[in-house]
Amino acid sequence: LSLLGFEPNEDFEHLVKESRGRRLSQASPDSSLLLTKSINATPHGGGQRMKMNSQEYRIMRRWIEQGMMPGKADDPRVVEIKVVPEQRRMRPASEQQIAVIALYSDGQQQDVTAAVQFESNDTEMADVTKRGIVSIKSLAGEVAVMARFQGQVALFRASVPILEGENQWPEPTNPIDAAVIAQLKSLNIPISNVCDDNTFLRRVTLDLTGQLPTLAEIKQFGSNPSAGKRSEWIEYLLSSENYAEHFANKWMLILRNRRDTPGQKAGSFAFHRWIREQIANNRPFDEFVRDIVAASGAIDVHPPVVWYRQVADTFSRLEDTSQLFLGQRIQCARCHHHPFEKWAQKDYFQMASFFSQVKTKPGQSPDETIVFTSMGAPRASHPKTGESLKPAGLDGPVIEDSDRRDPREALVDWMVDKQNRFFAKSISNRYWKHFMGRGLVEPEDDMRVTNPPSNPELLDALADQLTHSNYDLKALIRSICNSRVYQLDTEPNGENLRDRKCNSRHYPKRLGAEEILDSVDQFTATSTAFDSMPANTRAAALPDSSFRSYFLTVFGRPEGTTACECERSNESTLAQSLHFANSKELIAKLGEANALPQILSKSTSSHGENIGEVYLRAFSRLPSENELQSALAYIDKKENKQEAYQDLVWAILNCKEFLFNH
C-alpha cells in the first residue's frame, strides 16, 4: 500500500483487483485477508494493527460488505485540518486532550481525532497517545505535537513554564536578545550571566576562524581598555584570512567538493579557491548561490561548474539546491507525497523542470566537464499522470517565461526574492547553529511545518536582518556574535540547567575534526603534513574532502558525499579517546625537537610561568591555584623536565575543556 495512504486510487487497485481480488471477500467480510491480517488472526510482518470490532474494523468491514466501491471524483475531500486548542500554557506533569477537526471541500466539518496520527517533536518534554492526549513531563520549554490526517498536517503547541521563583532578565538592546528574552520571560526560565573576557575570546575566535587565540592575540585583546573591545575583536576576526579559510571549509564540504580521479584535482582546488575568495570578499549570499546554481561553461573559466560534477542528474541537483539553500528535504516527494510536509510529487517535478535543460559535455581533458543549457521549453513529466509540468518554485507560481532564458536563472530569482522566506530562514538557521551549537530548527536543513522552530520570532528576526542587509553574511555574523545571548556563560544558574533549546545559557559544543587537529598543532607548536600540500597547511585549508587522514576521519570529518551537514559527526566516541591516549601520531608530535614541551624545558622562565603559558595556549586563561600547584608538584618531582612537560601537554590535550568550545 502507498505510504500513509497518499495514493488511494493505487491502493484500491491493489486491494480489490490485484491477485484476482483474493485479499477481500464480500460474501464473507470477516475472512478477508485485509481484516484477518490487521487483527493478526493471520500472522504477518506488520503484527496487530487494530482490534476486532474496533471502529476501524467496523468501517472496513462495512465497506467490504457493501461491495468495495471506489470513491467518486466529486466526493468531498479534506482540504484542511485544525487542532483544538492550537496552543496552551501547561503545567509540568499535566495532560491536555486535543481534538482534530477536518474541513471538507463541500464545507462540512467532522471530528476525526480517533483517526488521526499524532507525534510529539520532543518526547523528553511530552508524549501523546493515539487518541490525542498530550502528557507533559517535567521539563520547561516549548513542545509541539503533530497531527496528520489524509495528507493534511496541523500542530498543537504547548508552553511549559517553570512555576517556582521570580527571575530578573536584562533589557534587550537588539532583536536577537529581544526574541530570546521574551521567550525566557514567558517560560520563567532564568538567564545565565555574560561570560568573562577570556571565555569570549576563545569562543569567538574558534567559531570565526577555527583556531585558538595565539599568545599575542590574548595579550592584544586583554590589554584593550575599550568598552567595545568585544565588537572590535569580532571585526578583527572577520577581516582575517583564517575566517575565510574556516567558512570556505564549511561550504566546500556541503557543496560536495571532492575528486574521484586524480585528473579532477585542478577543478576541486579551483572551486575551493573560488569559495574562499567569495567569503573573503563578503560576496552577498544571493549572488554566491546564483553563481553556483546557474553555473555554466568550463571549470577553468567558472569554477562553480565543479558542483555539477558531483550532482550529476536532475534529481540530485534539485534535491541539493532545496536542502542547501531552502532548508527543504524534498527527496521524499520524488516517489510519493511527502509524509511530513505538504509537498506532492507535482511540487517535486515542477522544481525539477528548472534543471531539465542542463546538459554536460567533455572538455579538453577526460576529467573536465562543460555545463550548458540546451534550447527548448523546460518541462518535467509527472511519473504517475504523465502531465507535462512547467517550472514552479515551492508554493510559487508557474514561471511562464522560463523557455526564453536559462530556467535556472528564473529559479534563483524566485529563491532569493525577499518575499520568499525559505531562503533567508534557511541560511539564518544554518549560521545560528554554527555559532550556538543548535539550530532553531533541527536538523538545520529540515524546515517544515511539522518541525517548527524553537523560537519562531527569533528566526523571523534573523531572516529579516539578512534580507534587509541584502544577504550580507558578515552582518548576520556580527548580529549573532555581538548579542548578549551569544556571549552568555555556559554555567547554568539553577533552573536553566535542563534548558536545551531556549538559549538561556551558551551550550558547549565539541570542536569539529579540523578544528581539533589544527588546535593540536597550534597548541603543541607542530604541524601535520598532507599529501601534495605546502608545509604548515591547516586542516581547515584543505581544498577538498579527498585528503586522507585517520585523525580527521576518527573525529568525524565528512567525505563530502552529500549536501547534509549531518554527514559530519561531532559526537565523542571511544575511538577518539583511545586515539588521544595512545596515538603514535600525537606522541611523535610531543617529541619533536621544536615542539612545545621542548621549548618549555629549555625556557629560562619559571615553571609557574611555563604552566601559565600552557593554559593560555590551550584555554586562553591562566590556571586556577589548584591547577597550578598540581602541575608544579608533578614537574618538581620529575627529574627529566622535558618528559614532565610532555606529560603536562599530553594531559591538557586529553581534557574535555580542550576539545570543546564553551
Region locations from a protein language model:
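Periplasmic/extracellular electron-transfer cofactor-ligation site
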Residues: L1-F12, R62, Q66-D74, R329-A344, ...
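Solvent-exposed helix-loop boundary motif
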Residues: L1-Y57, D74-I101, D106-T173, R203, ...
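Active-site rim elements
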Residues: R20-G21, G45-K51, P262, H506-Y507, ...
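Catalytic cores of secreted or luminal carbohydrate-active enzymes
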Residues: T36, M50-P70, A575-L586, L590-E592
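Short helix C-cap/helix-to-loop transition motifs enriched in small/turn-promoting residues
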Residues: P70, G151-L155, A227-G228, I299
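Extracytoplasmic
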Residues: E95, T113, G327, K346, ...
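Primarily short, surface-exposed interaction patches in extracytoplasmic proteins
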Residues: Q168-N242, A248-D531, C566-E567, I587-Y645, ...
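Long, His/Glu/Asp-enriched segments that create or flank divalent metal/ion-associated functional microenvironments
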Residues: T524-A541, S545, F551-A581
